[in-house]
Amino acid sequence: MQSEIITQKNGKGIFDRKAWLTESKKLYLSAKLLRSEGERNKKLLRAASKKSPIVHEYIDIASATDQTSRLMLGYAFEMLLKSAILLMNLGARKKAIENEFCNYGHKLNCMAVDLGLPLTVDELKLLKVASRDIVLNARYPIGIVDDNKYITELNERNIQLADENIFRDMVSLYDKIKSIVAKFDNDVANCANFNMLRLSEFTLFMRNGGGLSSRAIVIFSDKFPEVSKRKSYLKKAIEEHAGK
């Protein structure tokens, strides 16, 4: 029995594109709210007396919101990009999609490149920063044990996470990517075309247009020999079928 094909346009659960977009929006809004709360606490900190017992609480809240807002925004990017990866892989099996996501990991810039998003070099670098936030900077303690190096690294990380210019640029980039992704398969001026060829040996799903790169996905029958899984075989089979 063949594995279930789950990436139809109305997939379920984690293979529902709309669900990924919804989660992305929640994370995005949460990141912005946290950042605003952090800025409010920084103002309270600046106005408070250094001897006030609540000063340490203000400091902790400011540091926590700097870090957590960046982590959430990083995950918002990931949910947004993976919603488009799902769409690009229409017709793929569950295992193939899981492998695709596993291979990407948290490499947001790689997803953006594969999706053909029209981003600048600086915007791709910003996605790399968001990837590092997810993997390390906004997630795990610093791994340095030397006291002097630890303090230096901690200060650099805190300054970078607190940088409002970086956060604002990330928010703007998210908005840009979302506006592009929202048009995938929804633009009347660039409609997507879907075709399927079902033969006894394999099923071929093909998509082009819709704002995404053209892609063909092949699902071989369970008894299809491994040695024959070649592009040359597929080309010959398609040509023979087209000639009928």
Task: Describe the predicted segments one by one.
Residues 1-69:
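Charged alpha-helical initiation segments
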Residues 41-42, 85-91:
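Surface-exposed helix-capping loop/turn segments at secondary-structure junctions
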Residues 1-32, 89-244:
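Long, charged low-complexity segments
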Residues 32, 64-88:
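Short, hydrophobic, well-ordered secondary-structure elements
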